[in-house]
Amino acid sequence: MDKDRPGLPAPDDNIEEVPSTSGVQERASEGDWENVLIEISDSSSEEEAEDAHLEPSQRGKKRKRVDDDAGGSAPAQHVPPPQLDHPGREAILYRFPLDLRRFIQAIGAAATHPDTRAIDQFFGSQISNTDLYVMYAMAIRQAIRDRRRNPASRRSQVKWRMTTLAAGWPMGYQAYSSWMYSYTDPQVTATIIHLQATLGCASGRRCHVTFSAGTFRPPRCSPGDRQWLYVQSRVGDLVQSSNPCYSIFFDYMAIHRSLTKIWDEVVTPDQRVTFMEFLGFLQRTELVYIKSFVSYALGTTSIETPWMDENPSTETAQAWNAGLLRGRAYGQDLLRTEGEHGEGATCETREESEDTESDGDDEELPRVVSRDGTKHRRPPIFLRRLHRLLLMRAGKGKERARETLAKAPRRTYGTPRPPVQKPRPEVPQSYETATSHGSAQVPEPPPTHPLHQQHSMAPCMVAQNPRAPLGDQLPGVPKDGRGACAPVPALAGPIVRPWESSLLQSPGRAFAPVSPQPMPVEPVPVPTVALERPVCPAPPEIAMQGPGEPSGIKRTRERWRPAPWTPNPPRSPSQMSVRDRLARLRAEAQARQASVEVQPTQLTQVSPQQPMERPLEPEQQMFPGSPFSQVADVARESGVPAMQPQYFDLPLTQPISQGAPAAPLRASMGPVPPVPATQPQYFDIPLTEPINQGASAAHFLPQQPMEGPLVPERWMFQGATLSQSVRPGVAQSQYFDLPLTQPINHGAPAAHFLHQPPMEGPWVPEQWMFQGAPPSQGTDVVQHQLDDLGYPLHDLNHPGVPVSPAVNQYHFSQAAFGLPIDEDESGERSDTSEPYEALDLSIHGRPCPQAPEWPVQGEGGQDATEVLDLSIHGRPRPRTPEWPVQGESGQNVTDHEPRRVVVSAIVHMCQDDEFPDLQDPPDEA
């Protein structure tokens, strides 16, 4: 176990260690990023270095392959990997500085090495982006190579023991970031690419061994390197779109760098005609990046074929010359077609030849359908709800389900669907009602008064879309040639809907009562079932009497009974039946006539005809569940006539003085007559904060101007001392008890109090005094320490958690949040934590009081009392990556500032039977 653990941190951390990566070693000075050197060694030295790190028990034990054909007697000859011709280490070290093109060539050479061949299993030709290829290759390559070596002594390894909090990915990981310039056209500004390589292991095990490898840090690109990367990108796009028989020649040219060597040693006899076509394309191409690629690979732009003169055979030379001419003639189009691999080969493809063979057979050949093909329609599980219902109703038979699915209309995805016409149910003739909301089952209507019975009246359906006016929907009015219903007595006078009475009034005027003409029928008491009463118990109404009554306030209580259950109640007056509408109109007419004849002198009830003041929202915010504004809304929207005055019991414990009536009563019931001061009346409303003259609470909105000055004693909360005399303009000091751990300054009010318009009289700072704080003589800011307070502090349940909204500073520590503390292997805690910053919760520059130091034990038995700064004004913005903006031509928009792109790669090191050489050595007991 001790061998797998990292050593102590290095004393000098300025020199960052980058482990060797199979022949590629990066040396970067701190000030010069352009001159970076490379060391390339042959594969023999690499194998010797690996054997040196193997354990003694593993040395000298190499498995030998047995030839099956020879019966196990003769071992098979091991074919070594192809060796690349590179000059000596000293020549490359002093003659060739590391540029990105040689760096990528080293990666290509590493792919042929036995130990680094696993790179091909992670990615192949799918990545045409050069910088992504570099990042992925070097991250995986270093992880494979460095897991066999001793862990480097780096201080950052202490922080590498991390585990994600996600339940679905129990991985240990370490991310390392760097940046480089991207490849681009010379006319476009270079883009900065942020590279991030993340190394991880399963379940966070053996993290020190897995994370002991360094991370690839690419060198900064020079202008020549960016030009070369641009060429490689364009050539890579061409290779991806070319036929595989031609695209392999691009790799041969980039690796071997000689046409003669490719012709003699690499290309097979069957590929020579195709290779000649490829050379013909290179001779006549006009693409600039293809010419640059040939120049980088061969060192010249001329394409020569010296092997043509060495072969005197006439037939072979003619075939090669014909292929060269075809490449010149077709150009780039030749790379996208199927090549001719022989002299007598035809131009038809494999698919065409298979079609010609199948045409000769009369019998139909079996066809195998692949599941990976293009889906022309969605699977049955993704069918629409209508189709699924049809399939479910079809029964268990598969044939019936298929027939039902075939009959279902097929539409492409995204096309609008026509509205589904619902079948209109048949209304039985026995019922004399007709509703506009057709239902499948019409229950028996409740018993009604004989006056409401309409004899010999045919069913009259009311139009639902669009909704016609109420006058057009009444029976006896023919429309569009439809049969008229039986004649009924017409109403005299205009028809006024109660829910539209408020719309007829101007916004600045009060409601004008509408009194229709009396109906030519005998007044019959209308039962309550004919009215549209709310199902839930409606809130009570408030009524006050004038000063002439013998008793101050008359209190009564009415119990609201829920309306009897009616099947499928109408949603709006236009959807009611004709009988219910007629009964409702008669009841409303009688109610209005009764209210016009008997007009009270004082305010006795709340009705839609009474003027109501706005806004009603403040009362709802001040008193949760307050019924003041709901009464007017219910009376106005539902159109229920006010038959009798409604009262309810409201205990009052505070006087409503002559100068300022109660805000909720005034907002919902209009003007209130003055109340004599000799008979004080009280009401009790639970409040949690005082509303003083200096600053009103945030949830009290400005009301309409009230008669007389505002007296602070009227808004005293429960438990406060009441003033014996009511004097306008005099405000007394008010105190309340809250468990606070920090005083509030006199010079700055609390944060949750909003600014109000100036009021009469100077603002007294003593209005915001708290218990235990001595009053000040002036308006200066006074600081009070906790030691001077006479009451004990509140016991904190958890350090760092405020106990009152008045506390405007918070204190956090590592122990308060339960953060994990890194410990090294010796059991001592590593002092890698940075000091905490101060959190400033001040608003608009107001002074922040000194925070008390809560005794929070930190590391080493010391108190962690640093204050965290939470202010958002004037703080430096964190560095956030910016995404590049592409113009209309598809290229990046040119800016003076370089753009940034975040590129992240996650490399998961798998330790299983597939990579036995990657597994860690067994732990020693």
From Swiss-Prot:
The similarity comment for this entry is: Belongs to the herpesviridae EBNA-3 family.
- Name of the protein: Epstein-Barr nuclear antigen 3
Which UniProt key words apply to this protein? Answer: Host nucleus, Host-virus interaction, Transcription, Transcription regulation
Subunit notes for this chain?
Answer: Interacts with human UCKL1. Interacts with host CTPB1; this interaction seems important for EBNA3-mediated transcriptional repression. Interacts with host RBPJ. Interacts with host USP12 and WDR48; these interactions form a deubiquitination-competent complex.
Instruction: Please give the residue ranges the record annotates as the region Disordered.
Output: 1-88, 337-376, 394-454, 561-581, 873-898
Composition-biased stretches, type Acidic residues, lie in 351-364
User: What gene is this protein a product of?
Assistant: EBNA3
Q: Which organism is it from?
A: Epstein-Barr virus (strain AG876) (HHV-4)
Regions of compositional bias (Basic and acidic residues) in chain numbering? 396-405
Q: Does the keyword Transcription apply?
A: yes
Give any single GO term for biological process.
Answer: viral process
This entry carries the following GO cellular component terms, namely: host cell nuclear matrix
